[in-house]
């Protein structure tokens, strides 16, 4: 979480964690691939860690995102993703490829239909 001054709030609440046990992921082509948990480099074994951020709650307040004018806007919080390089296994062949991970929590808004009766 970013540090906020008194009186400042996030529109959406997020939680960030280091993920060390990821075994599968989606690559850039949309294929599910096997992520190697342990990586052997020069006879040393390393774990792959991924820093992931996701939304705590899609609706931090009953109307959706915090601070959005619910009279004119529909809103909800959603997790977005990005691609990072990871050592993966495909058909007994290890290779570096980009995999999708959770990276942020953002607010999505859409205008409500105004009814002028």
Swiss-Prot record:
Protein's cellular compartments: Secreted
Residues that carry a glycan: 21
Molecular function terms, GO-annotated: growth factor activity; lipid binding; metalloendopeptidase inhibitor activity; nerve growth factor receptor binding; toxin activity
Disulfide bonds: 12-77, 55-105, 65-107
Location (main, coarse): secreted
Keywords: Disulfide bond, Glycoprotein, Growth factor, Lipid-binding, Metalloenzyme inhibitor, Metalloprotease inhibitor, Protease inhibitor, Secreted, Toxin
SUPFAM superfamilies: Cystine-knot cytokines
Tissues in which the protein is found: Expressed by the venom gland.
InterPro entries: Cystine-knot_cytokine, Nerve_growth_factor-like, Nerve_growth_factor-rel, Nerve_growth_factor_bsu, Nerve_growth_factor_CS
Assembly: Homodimer; non-covalently linked.
Family that this chain belongs to: Belongs to the NGF-beta family.
Protein known as: Venom nerve growth factor
């Amino acid at each position: 979480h970013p540090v906020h001054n008194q009186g400042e709030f996030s529109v959406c609440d997020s939680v960030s964690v280091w993920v060390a046990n990821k075994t599968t992921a989606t690559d850039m082509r949309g294929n599910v691939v096997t992520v190697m948990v342990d990586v052997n480099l020069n006879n040393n074994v390393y774990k792959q860690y991924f820093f992931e951020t996701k939304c705590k709650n899609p609706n931090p307040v009953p109307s959706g995102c915090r601070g959005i004018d619910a009279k004119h806007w529909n809103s909800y919080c959603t997790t977005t993703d990005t691609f990072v390089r990871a050592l993966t296994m495909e058909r007994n062949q290890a290779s570096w490829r980009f995999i999708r991970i959770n990276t942020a929590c953002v607010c999505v808004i859409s205008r409500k239909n105004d009814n002028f009766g």
